[in-house]
């Protein structure tokens, strides 16, 4: 929300990992404007500063939510993007802004779309903490909602390793 603050913070950097975002899907239905301001405009601030400062690379964190309901598995980068919430729409918008800077200005960037990262300090609303909480509360039958979707889970340390490898890679 503060392009000058972003630019100042990025001065002297070679690589920027753009991780900032509002991520709680349910809240996006109540305050979509906040998601647009943070996720889309925030990404614009990052890529604009990266272009102006001639950074070596920007790694933009997106989300698997941009794909919506899987049309096929495994999902790959060719899968259509389907906004199913204001959150996912804001992340698609952020991806499009980033892609436009890559195409228009040759800004070296990579968009990463982690799937269901889990680990320490994770939100209690996520699936794994939900299961653990129910078990610790001694419930006899765990309640999860729709059991049909299949999900991949990625431990947070593995996500970090992936980001580091992407930063070290010469490929965009």
What is the predicted role of each segment?
Residues 1-117, 157, 167:
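N-terminal Rossmann-like NAD(P)+-binding domain of SDR-like oxidoreductases, especially those catalyzing
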Residues 37, 142-146:
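Short, hydrophobic secondary-structure boundary micro-motifs
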Residues 84, 115-125, 146-157:
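Glycine-rich "substrate-gating" loop/helix at the edge of Rossmann-like oxidoreductase active sites
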Residues 96, 126-130:
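Generic alpha-helical secondary structure signal
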Residues 103, 129-141, 153-172:
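Alpha-helical substrate-binding/gating segment
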């Amino acid at each position: 929300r503060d392009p000058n603050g972003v630019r100042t913070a990025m001065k002297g950097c070679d690589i920027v990992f753009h991780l900032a975002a509002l991520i709680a899907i349910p809240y996006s239905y109540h305050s979509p404007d906040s998601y647009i301001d943070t996720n889309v405009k925030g990404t614009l601030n990052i890529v604009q500063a990266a272009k102006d400062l001639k950074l070596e690379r920007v790694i933009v964190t997106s989300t698997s939510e941009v794909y919506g309901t899987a049309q096929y598995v495994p999902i790959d980068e060719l899968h259509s993007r389907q906004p199913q919430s204001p959150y996912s729409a804001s992340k698609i918008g952020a991806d499009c802004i980033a892609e436009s800077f890559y195409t228009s200005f040759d800004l070296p960037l990579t968009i990463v779309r982690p799937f269901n990262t889990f680990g320490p300090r994770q939100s209690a609303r996520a699936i794994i903490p939900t299961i653990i909480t129910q078990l610790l509360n001694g419930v006899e039958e765990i309640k999860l909602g729709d059991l049909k979707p299949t999900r991949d889970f990625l431990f947070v340390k593995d996500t970090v390793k992936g980001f580091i490898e992407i930063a070290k890679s010469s490929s965009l």
